[in-house]
């Protein structure tokens, strides 16, 4: 938890979460594969996670609408009544995508949330060329794979 490299990779540190309840997510960046198909205001029934120690290099994709949230201890952020909930960034030679949503089985059963997750995975993988596994063989057990 106190490993600075890991905090920069993840993009923030967990602070706390509100009780499970309905709230809205605001799509900030609709050009990302994990958000491009979502409505501008995305109604959720989930736990609203709060974070601290944000990496300034993250690209915020979605924020929580904190205004109507039922939570007497909700912190006040520089963004006012919003708080980042989904973000991504390029980091240390790779890519990272994070969603703070998805705390029950019903959420993962929806096609919309599955597409959200798949869009994040697609972005992380990027435009890598597929490997030709026909070339992945060794003549002896100690030979390196030729790809």
Please state what every model-predicted region is.
Residues 5-7, 44, 89, 125:
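Intrinsic disorder/low-complexity segments enriched in polar/charged and small flexible residues
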Residues 68-86, 90-147:
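Extracellular ligand-binding/catalytic regions of CAZymes and related secreted enzymes
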Residues 7, 35, 118-122:
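Non-transmembrane alpha-helical segments in soluble domains
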Residues 12-92:
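Catalytic beta-strand/loop cores that center a nucleophilic Ser/Cys/Thr
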């Amino acid at each position: 938890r106190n490993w600075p490299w890991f905090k920069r990779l993840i993009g923030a540190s967990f602070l706390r979460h509100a009780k499970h309840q309905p709230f809205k997510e605001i799509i900030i960046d609709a050009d990302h594969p994990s958000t491009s198909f979502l409505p501008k205001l995305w109604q959720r029934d989930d736990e609203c996670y709060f974070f601290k120690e944000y990496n300034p290099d993250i690209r915020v994709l979605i924020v929580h609408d904190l205004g109507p949230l039922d939570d007497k201890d909700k912190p006040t952020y520089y963004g006012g009544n919003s708080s980042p909930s989904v973000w991504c960034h390029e980091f240390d030679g790779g890519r990272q995508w994070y969603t703070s949503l998805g705390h029950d089985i019903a959420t993962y059963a929806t096609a919309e949330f599955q597409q959200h997750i798949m869009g994040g995975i697609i972005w992380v993988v990027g435009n890598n060329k597929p490997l030709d596994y026909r070339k992945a063989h060794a003549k002896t057990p100690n030979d390196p794979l030729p790809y």
